[in-house]
Structures are given as structure tokens and as C-alpha cells.
Curated annotation (Swiss-Prot):
It comes from the Archaea. SUPFAM superfamilies: Metallo-hydrolase/oxidoreductase. Gene3D superfamilies: Ribonuclease Z/Hydroxyacylglutathione hydrolase-like. PANTHER family: UPF0173 METAL-DEPENDENT HYDROLASE MJ1163-RELATED (PTHR43546), UPF0282 PROTEIN MJ1629 (PTHR43546:SF4). This is UPF0282 protein MM_2966. HAMAP family: UPF0282 (MF_01406). It comes from Methanosarcina mazei (strain ATCC BAA-159 / DSM 3647 / Goe1 / Go1 / JCM 11833 / OCM 88). Belongs to the UPF0282 family. Transmembrane segments: none annotated. InterPro entries: RibonucZ/Hydroxyglut_hydro, UPF0173_UPF0282_UlaG_hydrolase, UPF0282_hydrls.
Length: 303
């Protein structure tokens, strides 16, 4: 089994995209990328835009030879979009996907916006999308719908993915944020070797200490029972999240890392550092409007 993470907050942009290769199959999970429209009252810094472009290019390059595409839910950082925003992966950039098998979160318990995006995507593809929750097929399994964060808070649901080859098991936990024990127990029941999952959103005002404690307990459960736990996404939109990750790593013998570290790279928490990026590298007035029109690029902002 080969696992390659294509994008995540530790790569500088919002994503949870990865490739898993087993035998003749190449499975692309959550092929999307996005940037926060506003953080600290600021639009994305061009350094972040450059990072999002790198993730987009990696996703498009990896589509060659892909046999399966999984979409865990219909947020813009997890799927190609119908040109809603210049920092995402537009469906118009996709190659011909004829012959690729899709595995998707069904239409149940999703927002009206997510339902619209699902419809737009299958209209673009020219065929309907399956509802894959609870399905198993040839080494690939999908969970029933599980909460996007805390249960019964109105944040919708996501679908987790299990990929196995011989004695190796990879689990993509999507955006569960370690805030629902049932979802975590589902992962443990799958007996994972490697888990790639979103950590808790410490940066959000509605995230309370009790939720952080619950997330830590769930993270410890995963870290003690999986050989490698890759925690990223919501967790690393805040610098304190990286310290939370390192504290967790110090509590267990197994490997606990962010996505960049798993791929042998240095973490770049650009989302969390937007304010300091503007202070260190001021952005000319009108740059974002010019970028959207194709009149400005990121060449001067490559790290």
C-alpha cells in the first residue's frame, strides 16, 4: 500500500486530499482545496494562494491513472467546485473521468448548499453519484454517515473510508474532528494501521474546553491503537493546534504527526499565520481583484 497526502492545512491550504494505491487500484479521496475567505478580517494572502495552487496542481496530476474517487462530503475543501471561488479546484479543470468509479456521501442529512453542490457535480460529470455509506467492495469500505464534528449540532454528516491490502489498513476519517465517540469507535473497529483525520477546531469561538477534552480522549484512543495517526485539517488552522498535536504525541509510543510531517516536509501553517504574513509581506491594494481577473499572479510570493 502506498499513501500520498496531496493537501492539508500543514501544506498551507485547506484540504484533506490523498491518494492510496493498492495493487491495480489508485484511489483519490476528497480531491478539493480551499482557502478561508476571511481570517482576522483579511482575504487570503498571496502566499496562501500559491500554496492552494500547488495542491490543486498535485490533485490534477494525480488524476492520471486514478481508478476510484471518493467524496466524503460536499464542502469546497473536499471536492471540485463549479467555479465558486478562484482559490478552489474548479470542475472545469478536470480531465475526462470516464471509467473512474465514484464513491460518494449520499444526499441524506446534508445542507441545502451541499445538496446543490452534489447535483451540480453529477450534472457536470453527466451521470448520477452513488450513495456509498455502509458499502464494502474489494478492499474498500465506507462508514455509515457520521457527524461533521459534534453530533446533533446541525453541522451535517460525512463518510469515512477504509482501504485495506493484506495486513495494512488505511482509514480516512474526514472531518469528524474527533468529537464523536461512535465515529472513533467505528475507526477502531476497522483495526487501522494508519489513520488520517481532522483534529478539533480549536480556532472556532463555539469550540469549548469540554469539547477539547473529549477530542483529546478520542485522539488518545486512536493514537494508542493505530500505528500511525495523522492529525491535521481543522486542528492546524490555529498555531495552538500544533502544540496540541505535539502534546498528544508525547503521551503515546505510536507515531502521531501532521500531514506534512508524514510526507517528510516541514509544516507551513499559513492559514493560522495570515495576519503575520500581511505584516511581513504587505499586499498591494487591488491584488485580489486583479488575481480573479487573471491580471496578477503569485510569482512574487513563492516561499
Amino acid at each position: 500500500m502506498q499513501i500520498k497526502i496531496l493537501g492539508c492545512e500543514s501544506f498551507g491550504a485547506r484540504s484533506l486530499a490523498c491518494i492510496v494505491k493498492t495493487g491495480e487500484r489508485k484511489i483519490l479521496i476528497d480531491p478539493g482545496v480551499a482557502l478561508a475567505r476571511l481570517r482576522y478580517g483579511l482575504l487570503p494572502h498571496p502566499v496562501e494562494v500559491a500554496a492552494a495552487l500547488r495542491v490543486r496542481e498535485k490533485i490534477l496530476a494525480e488524476l492520471e491513472g486514478t481508478t476510484d474517487i471518493v467524496i466524503s462530503h460536499y464542502h469546497g475543501d473536499h471536492m471540485p467546485m463549479k467555479a465558486e471561488d478562484p482559490y478552489q479546484l474548479p470542475v472545469e479543470a478536470l480531465p475526462d473521468l470516464k471509467g473512474v468509479r465514484f464513491w460518494c456521501k449520499g444526499p441524506g442529512n446534508i445542507s441545502g448548499l451541499s445538496a446543490r453542490r452534489r447535483k451540480e457535480f453529477f450534472r457536470y460529470l453527466g451521470h448520477s453519484l452513488p450513495a456509498s455509506e455502509g458499502i464494502s467492495s474489494e478492499g474498500v469500505s465506507f462508514s455509515p454517515a457520521v457527524p461533521h464534528g459534534t453530533r446533533d449540532k446541525g453541522f451535517g454528516t460525512v463518510m469515512m473510508t477504509r482501504v485495506s491490502e493484506e495486513d495494512e489498513v488505511f482509514v480516512h476519517g474526514s472531518d469528524i474532528q474527533l468529537l464523536d465517540r461512535e465515529a472513533v469507535m467505528q475507526i477502531l473497529a476497522w483495526k487501522p494501521s494508519v489513520v488520517f483525520v481532522s483534529g478539533p477546531p480549536l480556532y472556532l469561538s463555539h469550540h469549548v474546553p469540554e469539547a477539547s477534552n473529549e477530542a483529546l480522549e478520542n485522539a488518545l484512543l486512536l493514537a494508542e491503537n493505530a500505528g500511525t495517526l495523522i492529525l491535521d485539517h481543522h486542528l492546524l488552522r490555529f498555531l495552538e493546534g500544533y502544540r496540541w498535536l505535539k502534546d498528544l504525541a508525547g503521551m503515546v509510543k505510536n507515531t502521531v504527526v501532521c500531514a506534512a510531517e508524514f510526507m517528510g516536509k516541514k509544516p507551513e501553517l499559513l492559514d493560522a499565520q495570515r495576519k503575520s504574513l500581511y505584516e511581513e509581506m504587505p499586499v498591494p491594494r487591488g491584488w485580489h481583484e486583479a488575481y480573479e481577473k487573471g491580471e496578477a499572479g503569485v510569482e512574487d510570493y513563492l516561499l
